[in-house]
Amino acid sequence: MLFFTLLIQLFLVPVLCQYACSSELKFGTACSENKTSTKWYYDSKLLFCYPYKYLGCGEGSNSFESNENCLESCKPADQFSCGGNTGPDGVCFAHGDQGCKKGTVCVMGGMVGFCCDKKIQDEWNKENSPKCLKGQVVQFKQWFGMTPLIGRSCSHNFCPEKSTCVQGKWTAYCCQ
């Protein structure tokens, strides 16, 4: 019995998690049993978890109650990429690494980094540290503190009521 349990935990659970994480986002359907809520899904293009408005019934397998649940289930702790999940132009071993060619910047992971296009990386960093022209960026609480509520697309209706969604090149954010 112990062998069977171990076999399931080592092989079946990771396969099912990967299936869920790579599944298409399903918003569900409106129904009288449940009300709408904000849930999270793993975006396999940008390799990150983003919020969306769940309509109440019929959610897909790529749907999580919280950002933390999504990240724990789908994103390996050592996974990183260049901004917008664009391809790297080499590897590096420290910020400011001179091994990266001109026009690229070292983006560090755990032990090694990628040489990423500087222009794209700057755009990515700006988009993930949003500023509102009017009002404040909507934030949400994570285990380490407050952080901007950033979604993949305004069409996912993740912004709270009475806030405005601002769409960027890769992601979107909410102003209030």
From Swiss-Prot:
Disulfide bonds listed in the record: C21-C74, C31-C57, C49-C70
Ranges for domain BPTI/Kunitz inhibitor: 21-74
Cited Pfam families: Kunitz_BPTI
Tree of life domain: Eukaryota
Positions bearing carbohydrate: N34
InterPro entries, sorted: BPTI/Kunitz_domain, Kunitz_BPTI, Kunitz_BPTI_sf
Natural source organism: Caenorhabditis elegans
Keyword Cell membrane tagged: no
GO molecular function: serine-type endopeptidase inhibitor activity
The protein, known as: BPTI/Kunitz inhibitor domain-containing protein C02F12.5
